[in-house]
Amino acid sequence: MDKRKKTAAELEEIVKQRIGAGDFRVTIHRNPEAGWHATIYGRQPAEVHRCQVMADTIAAELCQHYELDE
């Protein structure tokens, strides 16, 4: 199955929407093993941790369908 290409900004928006409301920022980075991964940044450590756990799960699912486009 061919993966659809998405820009980092598009993937960031998808991950942020799937996580939901909160005061955090999502960035997408290349990952040699999975293709790409999401990193969460924010001011509240508990929220960052909660969102990062969710982002890891979401990215694992989305990596099966989307490829990071430069």
Which residues does each PLM region occupy?
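N-terminal acidic leader/helix
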Residues: 1-27
